[in-house]
Amino acid sequence: MSRIVLAEAYRTPIGVFGGVFKDIPAYELGATVIRQILEHSQIDPNEINEVILGNVLQAGQGQNPARIAAIHGGVPEAVPSFTVNKVCGSGLKAIQLAYQSIVAGDNEIVIAGGMESMSQSPMLLKNSRFGFKMGNQTLEDSMIADGLTDKFNDYHMGITAENLVEQYQISRKEQDQFAFDSQQKASRAQQAGVFDAEIVPVEVPQRKGDPLIISQDEGIRPQTTIDKLAQLRPAFKKDGSVTAGNASGINDGAAAMLVMTEDKAKALGLQPIAVLDSFGASGVAPSIMGIGPVEAIHKALKRSNKVINDVDIFELNEAFAAQSIAVNRELQLPQDKVNVNGGAIALGHPIGASGARTLVSLLHQLSDAKPTGVASLCIGGGQGIATVVSKYEV
């Protein structure tokens, strides 16, 4: 069978919570990336067989946000679309589903990725549909409820990171150092233009005058210092060590790519970036969900007949510094291969988009000298997902 390849991989800049993208729905961020894929590839949009996009915080957007993003992005109405929710793994799961649909013979070319607007997630007034007889009622934050809370233990994702702190005896100093390093790496990469090739500028309409053109990630903090990080209070536990500074942000963004057969790429005159080698998924205790990538990576590597030492680049989502440190310890990863341009602590974590974002960033780093990469994420509820890719060679 023809190999499954990836091409035209892009992402939006990542906006901070309540920042530059606060008035832009997730589906419009997704549409921006889809539009770029179609315009840059110059393929006939009718060639697309399906659009699959991850999106976690869907409430209030309208039916099937992936469908809205696809049509707004220029995909014909005749092309079907569907939306995936695997929490933080949604964007990468969408790409896996595209891969599987092609292997099954259902599709030849798919746009797949993820999108999220955490800024636009609504407040919920539960049990209000049929009215209240008496008493006060409380609004529920859909972002916290559907994106950041472990339903099994009824606590915030930050507590799952604190659980790993205890299990792996991770110090506050280690976490702050990890966060500082992420910020510094991302800042250097941004200043050097490393992200320019993967980022699609986004137009943000203004009340008066021309729209703002946003072309850089909003949340990178080059002025962060170890001392400033050390001054932050624990965010989730009275005597804890997980803070707003050593955890990923709350963000808005989108990322996507073309997934297709090698034969289809040749027929359309497209130059693939990479070959999709394998995927892996895991289930772990929800209370330590952050360790999920370990088994997922092992499974993905085994399916591609590779081991850790065969991998040149790791893009691992930094949900929390503690979680990342635990995964790195378990896998004994060489740190000069991991998130060399920073990760989600600096860049941000728009949950439905991050799976695709990590892979987009990985694809743009592949080279003849570093041809093999792994992208992986932990997933709320106690799961992990990973993929192995290799630089495309004819």
From Swiss-Prot:
Main location class: cytoplasm
Keywords: Acyltransferase, Cytoplasm, Transferase
EC number: 2.3.1.9
Top-rank taxon: Bacteria
Residues annotated as catalytic: 88, 349, 378
Short name of any one Pfam family annotated for the protein: Thiolase_C
Family as reported in the entry's similarity comment: Belongs to the thiolase-like superfamily. Thiolase family.
Protein's UniProt name: Probable acetyl-CoA acyltransferase
Organism, as annotated: Staphylococcus epidermidis (strain ATCC 35984 / DSM 28319 / BCRC 17069 / CCUG 31568 / BM 3577 / RP62A)
